[in-house]
């Protein structure tokens, strides 16, 4: 055999081996294909097994009897029949996502949006290197975002929004070079904005809304030239308006609302971002003027910059924005209360597509122009409230046929309401409160069948309440209080099935409260106080089972209290200043939610119950009912006589009548003698001491003057410094003792040399004289006289609080009496005090006939009685909202006192903002944080922008509630009994929510007290019982 044969044989053998090898390879490939198809199937079945049985039914086709590629939501490739897409969006599936999903190696699209998946996102998803579309939004996923998702290098869409994901955005996401959409909004993400995202040059949409990401926006973002949608609203970003955003000239949608951006906006803003259609920048701290160049953005459709600190005029050039749909500039400082402030409204008549216009709560002045009637007929909301706009509402308002909300409240408007309002059939809210409007309420308002809110309170409307309002069948809140309305309450109002609030207080209404009041099944609050209503209180009130506030005081109701034992949700019940008679029902002691009960100045007789609300004299009042007996000892009522046996009852009755008649005659004779003596002394005193002050203070004197200067001088030792217990904005407070029982009192002497003190005196008398609440300090009497040198003298005499003020308890080391180790407050006591203060503020803000803003809530104005119950004091700063003296408004508000105390005063007060109940909310929030941290807002720790609010907020984000808590609390025993961290965290959150810088971001006092009471019930149930 030669070499050629050997070679030939080797070639033949090699060919055979190759043939065998190829055949084996084909077999292996076929087997591999079969295995991988089976792998996809098993992966999906494993996925199904992790879905709860109740929601698994929609995956019924996922079984061995049907081909894999025909399963619900499954898509396969045409060539290899491998699974390339899984779309289970919106199927409401519950469970966890199986890690076997990572075995779907050909998967290009995975949609699990709008389900209820929970747990962590499996890291195995990072194995899907072909994945282009991943949507897991609107689920319940928690934990961190898996860094391995950055391995999915083909991703163009990544949507993990609306979950509970935590920690930061992975820096590695900067390597996803094909990413077009990145949506991580509505999670709990923290940390900084990754600069690496500047590498995503294909990115067009970025959404980080509603997280807790902080810091500044990195300059690298300027490289995202294709960006058209950029939303980082409701985070914690700070610094000036992000400079790199000015380079994103392709932007169509920009939202940075609800952060802490500050500084001014560039004048060329509109030239740099010429393609914007939607611009949201509200709830930040921007200052300066609105850039005129915004009007160069011809495509602009929505411009919303509320709740900042913008000043200057609203540009007339906005009239060039032909596509404008929405303009929101409310809660700034735009305008200067001058006549030209509203000129922009004329320019906006050119914006024919305008649907929403809100410039409320600025500094706009001038007359309401008639050309507002020429605004777009597509306008659905017109809000100009909270300014100083004068003039009248033009008849042409009826041209705005699409209007749903009309808010002109808290202005200086006068004149009559135009009947054309009734032509606006789409109206839902009419808010015209706190103006000087007069005339009759137009009956045409009854034509607005869909009306839900009608606020006409605090005007000068007269005439009767239109019966046509009974046609407004969707009315929820009807507030006509503090007007001059007369006649009776129309029975048509009792036919409103959805009415929740009915307030007709402080009018001149007559007649009975109608029996058909019981038809209002959903009524939460009924206030008919201070009218001239008569007759008996209808028994049908018992049918209003939702009632929480029933205010009938200041009328002429007669007869007994009806059986309303079914109204177990009552919180405030005031029947005072009527002619009611009979006994006080025992069942009222079972009203467990009742916070305030006032039965004073009636003709009730019999025994006062001793349980429930009747155990607390600060929560109820029965004075002025001379025939009452019994009750708890502190009421100091006569004891109830023991009932006599029946056989002697008639004789005893005759004896009782005779004796009573004789005693009454003697008493009357004595009273006449006393009165004549007093009258002679009174005339002599008036002639000797009273001068022109009689004219200024006569309404107050006639009701309050019960004590002389001489008495106060003696009881305070000549106003000696040894009896000085404090001082405030308008004077000093001394301790004294009055009456035969030497009752301790606190005497507040007003400093009349300080501007506003006399007005403070009148305001405080008016405020305290008309309200009663267990957490408000009680006014005992006043003195309006002259001192020994003939100078005017004004003093308020309060009930003395033996435990001083809250400031002494929170900061005992700063008081001279540092040796008192018992002056400490535990967690439960502090929470109770906070709830007491909140309760007083809710009452002032909501249940007085005019809302009252205290304007100086701070620990030294919170007094503690012997039981450590808190009482809010010092109404010297209180302004009765909605009743400002229009002529001297600016003078009154410019006084230093009304702006509150540094550290506790709301930020808007420092910028000329109106005194408001939301300012009290801020002050309460700061006090609440001080109560539990033990740190004053003026602590030297708070510098360089750090405040008690931001200090607490930062600690909450880091879950360090215990680290900022007052050590006195931590030394207590509570930590052994319950989760103190959770309790403190919840309390701090309430304080932070109340003390937000912008008023619109603060919760109401009603919401605050609800949260605090809920915390107490959750953690201190044993202590309460």
Curated annotation (Swiss-Prot):
Membrane recorded as keyword: yes
Coiled-coil positions: none
Stretches in topological domain Cytoplasmic: 675-1025
UniProt membrane topology term: Single-pass type I membrane protein
Phosphothreonine: residues bearing it: 716
This protein's UniProt keywords: ATP-binding, Cell membrane, Glycoprotein, Kinase, Leucine-rich repeat, Membrane, Nucleotide-binding, Phosphoprotein, Receptor, Repeat, Serine/threonine-protein kinase, Signal, Transferase, Transmembrane, Transmembrane helix
Residues carrying covalently attached carbohydrate according to the record: 63, 103, 135, 151, 188, 199, 247, 296, 331, 336, 350, 374, 447, 458, 486, 503, 579, 590, 598, 616
Gene3D superfamilies with a match to the protein in the record: Phosphorylase Kinase, domain 1 (3.30.200.20), Ribonuclease Inhibitor (3.80.10.10), Transferase(Phosphotransferase) domain 1 (1.10.510.10)
Span of domain Protein kinase: 719-1020
Reactions accelerated catalytically: L-seryl-[protein] + ATP = O-phospho-L-seryl-[protein] + ADP + H(+); L-threonyl-[protein] + ATP = O-phospho-L-threonyl-[protein] + ADP + H(+)
Predominant place of localization: membrane
Catalytic center residues: 856 (proton acceptor)
Transmembrane segment boundaries: 654-674
Residue intervals annotated with topology Extracellular: 31-653
Enzyme kind, highest EC tier: transferase
Binding site for ATP: 725-733, 748
Protein name as annotated: Putative receptor-like protein kinase At3g47110
């Amino acid at each position: 055999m030669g070499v050629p044969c050997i070679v030939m044989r080797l070639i033949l053998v090699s060919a055979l081996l190759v043939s065998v090898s190829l055949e084996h390879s084909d077999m292996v490939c076929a087997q591999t294909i079969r295995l991988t198809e089976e792998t996809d199937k098993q992966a999906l079945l494993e996925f199904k097994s992790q879905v709860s049985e109740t929601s698994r039914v929609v995956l019924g086709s996922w079984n061995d009897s049907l081909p894999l590629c025909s399963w619900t939501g499954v898509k396969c490739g045409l060539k290899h029949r491998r699974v390339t897409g899984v779309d289970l969006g919106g199927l409401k599936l519950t469970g966890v996502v199986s890690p076997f999903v990572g075995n779907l190696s050909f998967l290009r699209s995975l949609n699990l949006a709008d389900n209820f998946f929970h747990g962590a996102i499996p890291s195995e998803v990072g194995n899907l290197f072909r994945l282009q579309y991943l949507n897991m939004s609107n689920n319940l996923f928690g934990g961190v975002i898996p860094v391995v998702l950055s391995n999915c290098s083909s991703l163009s869409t990544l949507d993990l929004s609306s979950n509970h994901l935590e920690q930061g955005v992975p820096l590695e996401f900067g390597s996803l070079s094909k990413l077009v959409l990145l949506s991580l909004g509505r999670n709990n993400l923290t940390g900084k904005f990754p600069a690496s995202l500047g590498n995503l040059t294909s990115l067009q949409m970025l959404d980080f809304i509603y997280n807790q990401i902080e810091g500044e926006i990195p300059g690298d973002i300027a490289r995202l030239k294709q960006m058209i949608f950029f939303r980082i609203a409701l985070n914690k970003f700070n610094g000036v308006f992000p400079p790199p955003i000015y380079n994103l000239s392709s932007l169509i949608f920009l939202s940075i609302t609800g952060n802490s951006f500050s500084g001014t906006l560039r004048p060329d803003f509109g030239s740099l971002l010429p393609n914007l259609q939607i611009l949201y920048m509200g709830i930040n701290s921007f200052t300066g003027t609105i850039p005129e160049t915004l009007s160069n953005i011809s495509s602009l459709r929505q411009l919303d910059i509320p709740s900042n600190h913008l000043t200057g005029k609203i540009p007339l050039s906005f009239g060039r924005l032909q596509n404008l749909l929405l303009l929101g500039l409310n809660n700034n400082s735009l305008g200067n209360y001058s006549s030209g402030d509203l000129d922009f409204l004329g320019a906006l008549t050119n914006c024919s597509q305008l649907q929403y216009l809100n410039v409320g709560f600025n500094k706009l002045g001038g007359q309401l122009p008639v050309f507002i009637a020429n605004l777009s007929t597509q306008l659905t909301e017109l809000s100009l409230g909270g300014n100083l706009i004068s003039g009248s509402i033009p008849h042409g308002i009826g041209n705005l046929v699409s209007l749903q909300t009309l808010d002109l409240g808290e202005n200086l408007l006068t004149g009559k309401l135009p009947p054309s309002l009734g032509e606006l059939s789409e109206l839902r809210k009419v808010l015209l409160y706190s103006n000087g409007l007069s005339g009759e309420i137009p009956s045409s308002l009854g034509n607005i069948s869909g009306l839900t809110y009608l606020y006409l309170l605090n005007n000068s409307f007269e005439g009767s309440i239109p019966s046509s309002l009974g046609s407004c069948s969707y009315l929820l809140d009807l507030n006509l209080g503090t007007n001059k309305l007369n006649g009776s309450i129309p029975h048509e109002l009792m036919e409103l099935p959805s009415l929740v609030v009915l307030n007709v207080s402080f009018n001149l209404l007559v007649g009975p409260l109608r029996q058909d009041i019981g038809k209002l099944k959903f009524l939460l609050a009924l206030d008919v106080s201070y009218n001239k209503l008569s007759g008996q209180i209808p028994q049908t009130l018992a049918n209003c089972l939702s009632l929480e506030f029933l205010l009938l005081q200041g009328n002429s109701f007669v007869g007994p209290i009806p059986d309303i034992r079914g109204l177990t949700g009552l919180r405030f019940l005031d029947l005072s200043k009527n002619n009611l008679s009979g006994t006080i029902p025992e069942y009222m002691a079972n009203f467990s939610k009742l916070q305030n009960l006032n039965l004073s100045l009636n003709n009730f007789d019999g025994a006062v119950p001793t349980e429930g609300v009747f155990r607390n004299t600060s929560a109820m009042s029965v004075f002025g009912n001379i025939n009452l007996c019994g009750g708890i000892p502190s009421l100091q009522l006569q004891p109830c006589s023991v009932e006599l046996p029946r056989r002697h009852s008639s004789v005893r009755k005759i004896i009782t009548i005779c004796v009573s008649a004789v005693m009454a005659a003697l008493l009357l004779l004595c009273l006449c003698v006393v009165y004549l003596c007093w009258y002679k002394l009174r005339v002599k005193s008036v002639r000797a001491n009273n001068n022109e002050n009689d004219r200024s203070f006569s309404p107050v004197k006639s009701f309050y003057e019960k004590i002389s200067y001489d008495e106060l001088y003696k009881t305070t030792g000549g106003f000696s410094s040894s009896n000085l217990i404090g001082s405030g904005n308008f004077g000093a407070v001394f301790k004294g003792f009055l009456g035969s029982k030497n009752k301790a009192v606190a005497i507040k002497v007003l400093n009349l040399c300080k501007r506003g003190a006399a007005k403070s005196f009148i305001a405080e008398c008016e405020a305290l004289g008309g309200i009663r609440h267990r957490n408000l300090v009680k006014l005992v009497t006043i003195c309006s006289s002259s001192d020994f040198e003939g100078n005017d003298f004004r003093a308020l005499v309060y009930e003395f609080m033996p435990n001083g003020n809250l400031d002494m308890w929170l900061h005992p080391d700063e008081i001279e009496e540092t040796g008192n180790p018992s002056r400490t407050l535990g967690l439960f006591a502090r929470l109770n005090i906070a709830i007491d203060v909140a309760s007083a503020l809710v009452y002032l803000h909501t249940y007085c006939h005019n809302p009252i803003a205290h304007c100086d809530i701070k620990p030294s104005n919170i007094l503690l009685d012997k039981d450590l119950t808190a009482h809010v004091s010092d109404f010297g700063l209180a302004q009765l909202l909605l009743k400002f003296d229009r002529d001297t408004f600016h003078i009154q508000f410019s006084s230093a006192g009304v702006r509150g105390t540094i550290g506790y005063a709301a930020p808007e007060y420092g910028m000329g903002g109106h005194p408001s109940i939301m300012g009290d909310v801020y002050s309460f929030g700061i006090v609440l944080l001080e109560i539990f941290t033990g740190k004053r807002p003026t602590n030297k720790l708070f510098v360089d922008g750090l405040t008690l609010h931001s200090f607490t907020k930062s600690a909450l984000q880091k879950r360090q509630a215990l680290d900022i808590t007052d050590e006195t609390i931590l030394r207590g025993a509570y930590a052994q009994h319950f989760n103190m961290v959770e309790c403190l965290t919840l309390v701090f959150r309430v304080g932070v929510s109340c003390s937000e810088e912008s008023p619109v971001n603060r919760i109401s006092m009603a919401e605050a007290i609800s949260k605090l009471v809920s915390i107490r019930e959750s953690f201190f149930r044993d202590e309460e019982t």
